[in-house]
């Protein structure tokens, strides 16, 4: 083996089954984290076979992984989401007005709860069985040694659980981008059942990975080996725009959860600065790209004309990145409670990769992890929704700098060192280090 083909790990054959309902180039935010793991496993010397969902063309963009995939099979989807997509779904997600209908909201509630999410949730029962039997065949034919799955949806973890029961030699790594809703909201009637289910499910996992300490604290109730991977920043220098945008642009990319996220505190502060003559209203431009354009419009249209609101449901990845790189400020809207902490969106790391200023608005209590991560990148920019004075002062500074063609210092080099691809690769080596024997195959 020559130097070009040498990898981080030893040279023993390591064959990974990458079981992921979402997989690039599907245009959802989770694809970014999935892509990072895929690249990390390649760097650690794995041969990878992929089982994933077969999505409509409008959900897929350009290929974003230019690395070798040994085998890939896209499973037809027949779940509740697929059923609705033929009638009322917009870009594979329900409009917010439909979600407020009693019947639909009740159905969605069951769809997200254990055990119903395994039957009618994303993926569904047909996806589950096709993936399981395809995986059984691949494990035997391709001598699979490792499994990787990522929640959500939970169905991938359950398939891995079944495979681990069938083939005990497999080394299973389970990733949680978020907690299952039944664990996240203890007031649900099936909370005890969900805890029992998750505890027995994760007994079969050899390693568990999650995005933050907050979620790790919850998962420690179900597993002893919790590892944290928040995200990574490429060490490659980004090409920053040489021309400052003619507008003071606020850019938001991603989904919106209207019961938890709230843009109105920012809008109120900006309107106050306009009223005081500090900001010229005509300088403002709002850009949005994501699955919930209607809610974003609801926040803005009472206060700003249509020509100052540029909203797209879907954009190709290069165009979305161009918006982020041209923005005066990239927005992160998150939330935090005494029960639910550690909500880290992958969009934060996507923003940090651009070298442009980031504003994090938290609805609720202080989110220390998010604030700490941002502190490696810029001196200010994290605010709770109630911190009107601090937010007002920061926006004033940002606007004056933009008006004077001055850039705001963002230390992309420092954040790239702190959350490097090497750190990611080392974590993957750690959680996958056990090389199983080839028994019972």
Feature annotation, model-predicted:
Residues 383-393, 400-434:
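A charged, aromatic-enriched C-terminal amphipathic alpha-helix characteristic of glycosyltransferases
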Residues 52, 73, 171, 181, ...:
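Donor nucleotide-sugar binding/catalytic pocket of nucleotide-sugar-dependent glycosyltransferases
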Residues 53-126:
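A conserved catalytic-core segment of Leloir-type glycosyltransferases
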Residues 261-264, 316-318, 322-323, 330-349, ...:
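Nucleotide-sugar-dependent
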Residues 1-81, 207, 216, 273, ...:
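N-terminal subdomain of nucleotide-sugar transferases
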Residues 243-261, 267:
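Conserved donor-binding/catalytic core segment of Leloir-type glycosyltransferases
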Residues 283, 288-290, 295-321, 378:
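Nucleotide-activated donor-binding/catalytic signature segment of Leloir-type glycosyltransferases, i.e.
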Residues 36, 118, 126, 132-137, ...:
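Membrane-proximal helix-turn-helix segments that form the acceptor-binding/catalytic region
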């Amino acid at each position: 083996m020559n130097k070009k083909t040498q990898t981080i790990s030893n040279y023993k054959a390591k064959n990974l089954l990458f079981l992921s309902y979402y997989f690039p180039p599907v245009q959802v935010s989770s694809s970014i984290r999935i892509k990072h793991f895929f690249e990390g496993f390649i760097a650690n010397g794995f041969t990878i076979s992929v089982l994933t969902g077969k999505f409509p063309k409008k959900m897929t963009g350009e290929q974003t992984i230019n690395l070798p995939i040994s085998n890939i099979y896209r499973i037809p989807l027949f779940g509740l989401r697929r059923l609705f997509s033929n009638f009322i779904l917009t870009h594979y997600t329900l409009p917010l007005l439909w979600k407020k209908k009693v019947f639909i909201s009740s159905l969605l509630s069951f769809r997200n709860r254990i055990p119903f999410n395994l039957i009618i949730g994303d993926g569904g029962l047909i996806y589950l069985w096709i993936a399981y039997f395809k995986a059984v065949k691949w494990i035997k034919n391709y001598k699979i040694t490792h499994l990787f799955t990522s929640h959500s949806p939970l169905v991938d973890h359950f398939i891995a659980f079944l495979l681990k029961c069938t083939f005990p030699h497999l080394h299973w790594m389970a990733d949680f981008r978020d907690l299952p809703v039944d664990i996240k909201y203890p007031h649900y009637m099936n909370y005890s059942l969900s805890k029992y289910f998750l505890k027995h499910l994760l007994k079969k996992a050899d390693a568990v990975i999650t995005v933050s300490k907050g979620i790790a604290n919850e998962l420690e109730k179900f597993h002893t080996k919790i590892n944290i991977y928040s995200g990574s920043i490429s060490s490659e220098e980004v090409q920053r725009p040489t021309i400052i945008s003619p507008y003071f642009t606020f850019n938001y990319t991603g989904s919106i959860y209207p019961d938890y996220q709230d843009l109105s505190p920012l809008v109120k502060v900006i309107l106050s600065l306009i009223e005081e003559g500090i900001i010229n209203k005509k300088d403002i431009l709002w850009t949005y790209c994501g699955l919930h354009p209607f809610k974003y419009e609801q926040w803005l249209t009472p206060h700003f004309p249509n020509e100052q609101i540029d909203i797209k449901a879907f954009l190709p990845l290069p165009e979305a990145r161009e918006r982020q790189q041209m923005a005066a400020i990239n927005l992160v809207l998150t939330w935090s409670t005494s029960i639910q902490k550690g909500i880290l969106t992958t969009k934060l790391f996507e923003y940090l990769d651009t070298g442009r200023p980031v504003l994090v608005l938290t609805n609720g209590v202080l989110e220390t992890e998010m604030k700490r991560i941002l502190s490696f990148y810029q001196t200010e920019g994290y605010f709770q929704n109630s911190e009107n004075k601090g937010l007002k002062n920061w926006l004033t500074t940002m606007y004056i700098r933009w008006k004077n063609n001055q850039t705001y210092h963002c230390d992309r080099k420092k954040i790239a060192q702190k959350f490097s691809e090497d750190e990611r690769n080392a974590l993957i080596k750690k959680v996958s280090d056990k090389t199983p024997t080839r028994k019972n195959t």
